[in-house]
UniProtKB/Swiss-Prot annotation:
NCBIfam families: rpmH_bact. One of its GO terms (biological process) is translation. The keyword Ligase does not apply. It comes from Thermus oshimai. PROSITE patterns: RIBOSOMAL_L34. Pfam families: Ribosomal_L34 (PF00468). Part of the 50S ribosomal subunit. The open reading frame (ORF) for this protein is entirely within the ORF for the RNase P protein (RnaP). The two start codons are separated by four nucleotides. Residues 29-48 have a biased composition (Basic residues). This is Large ribosomal subunit protein bL34. The lineage of its organism: Bacteria, Thermotogati, Deinococcota, Deinococci, Thermales. Keywords: Ribonucleoprotein, Ribosomal protein. Residues 26-48 are annotated as: Disordered. GO terms for cellular component: ribonucleoprotein complex; ribosome.
Length: 48
């Protein structure tokens, strides 16, 4: 059986990236909550 994690940077950015979050009201709420909580990163790292 194929494993569930098939890394793909473009896919990761498109689904969890900053611009993807800003695009929807729910995503903006996510960023707002993470800012309030004081997270170092608002979105997962895509580029290293």
């Amino acid at each position: 059986m194929k494993r569930t994690w098939q890394p793909n940077r473009r896919k990761r950015a498109k689904t969890h990236g900053f611009r993807a979050r800003m695009r929807t009201p729910g995503g903006r709420k996510v960023l707002k909550r993470r800012r309030q909580k004081g997270r170092w990163r608002l979105t997962p790292r895509v580029h290293r």
